């Protein structure tokens, strides 16, 4: 059994303002950490749990069924489909939604999933294991320009060009199949002073590949906008991000929804934005959690409420 510690668990549950009869969505169910706490607070309400990962379904069911089999529904789908999947079930409005955008520990810790540079495994990185696109396909088939683009945009790696060029040269000789093979290629493109720095030299490239394989940024932007439209009055969206790219999208969307940009000279008064930011600055983990859970160091939580 792989143990996944939910980040900012107590804080997220508190700011959701859970009503016992409310309708809630956990967009990223994973091992059921957040879901179990939401479900335990419901009486006549209902929780809809989204996750496209087969293991997440099995793991969360073990956690949630003992609490209540009647008060939750697991929807095995990417959260980009939140609106359409809920509409199929006759759900048009919700009282709260939670996104925990970090990769679950079990996904990192199962070597064959290929998410981690710490294990030698096939280059996979798919959240949905039924989709065709894998990290191996990207590494071996995408053009130099496309590799450099995703390494720069999604990995923000200053050596994106050099790494993309090294991959291009390597695959002329042989196909790159595994995580360790890719790590070796990445290291070959970096100067000694970078290799001697703290932190793994492949971290940003692996992040870029994971985002590209799963189309994570576009999917989140579509999903959060759909979710905000579904919120009831006083309903809240709570988002936990783990890197600057996701946080930037969240911050931008929340700002757009909570402000009204009226051109100068336009005689409009008393016009209110339909949403309110609950926190001006993101909530971060307390010292105690940082000591217990390494994943918490990069976590930021933002909250918005429908007026």
Predicted regions and their residues:
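S-adenosyl-L-methionine-dependent methyltransferase catalytic core, i.e., the SAM/SAH-binding region
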Residues: 1-307
